[in-house]
Regions:
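Residue-level signal for inorganic ion chemistry
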Residues: 31, 58, 96
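Gly/Ser/Thr-rich active-site cleft segment
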Residues: 76-193
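Short, hydrophobic/amphipathic alpha-helical packing segments
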Residues: 12-20, 90-93, 193-200
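Glycine-rich phosphate-binding loop of actin/hexokinase-like ATP-binding domains
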Residues: 40-45, 49-68, 107, 111-146, ...
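Conserved FAD-binding subdomain of flavin-dependent enzymes
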Residues: 22, 60, 70-74
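Residues that line or immediately flank small-molecule/substrate-binding pockets and catalytic motifs
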Residues: 35, 57, 166
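N-terminal glycine/serine-rich phosphate-binding loop of ATP-dependent small-molecule kinases
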Residues: 1-52, 106, 161, 177-190
Length: 220
């Protein structure tokens, strides 16, 4: 492919090796995946990728900045700021569809990045609220529904079912249980956006109202 993208098969081998080693050393009784919120996976009706998972630092979406700005929802609808490159997932989709006119028709379902790995572990496709609500332009948090952008892009019916991070996607697939030594009844949770994951302990443990001053995703 001509665009910058993730080597998901190498990541998959790394993940399986990590699960195998962790199971051997400590044991695993549940799995949840957390990632950044600026990538998305397009799957066909067999659950396979129909396009590479775009690196959010790829500048391709900047090529259609004016056109995209004309269709993206207002901040008052989504709470998403307008960000450069592929940091708005909606811009990624718009750019990818403009580059490949057949891509939308090939796409059966769209999943957020943590849930792509959850899908590979379980075979179940979903999106989660924290990832879809993370500056994607695709989520209306006030109405708790897909934003108007999805309809404009013609993907409302393609975005996989949106569930909570604590919901269970399913159990690991038998072949993964065999490869890793993990119990085949091990649940895989939906997964969560990384910055929301770092906020969650405060939400759970802090009584009453509070403020968190965060550096964002990365801390050095």
């Amino acid at each position: 492919p001509s665009q910058s993208h993730y080597n998901v098969e190498s990541h998959w081998v790394f993940l399986l090796n990590g699960l195998h080693n962790f199971q051997k050393l400590h044991g695993i009784d549940a799995i949840s995946v957390t990632t950044h919120g600026a990538s998305i996976a397009l799957l066909d009706d067999m659950g396979n990728l129909v396009a590479p998972i775009l690196d959010y630092e790829h500048t391709g979406p900047d090529e259609i900045e004016v056109e995209y700005n004309n269709i993206r929802p207002l901040f008052s609808e989504t709470g998403s700021p307008r960000l450069p490159m592929g940091l708005n997932v909606g811009a990624q989709l718009y750019w990818m569809f403009s580059k490949n006119r057949e891509l939308k028709a090939k796409t059966a379902s769209i999943v957020t990045y943590p849930q792509y790995w959850g899908h590979r572990l379980t075979g179940v496709a979903a999106t989660d609220l924290t990832s879809l609500g993370c500056h994607t332009d695709l989520w209306d948090p006030y109405s708790r529904k897909i934003s108007s952008l999805a309809e404009k892009l013609g993907v409302s019916a393609k975005i996989a079912n949106t569930i909570s991070s604590h919901d269970i996607l399913g159990v690991i697939l038998p072949e993964i249980a065999y490869q890793t030594g993990i119990d085949p009844d091990t649940p895989v949770y939906c997964g969560i956006h990384d910055s929301n994951a770092s906020l969650l302990p405060h939400v759970i443990n802090q009584p009453g109202s509070f403020s968190v001053v965060s550096s964002g995703t990365w801390v050095i």
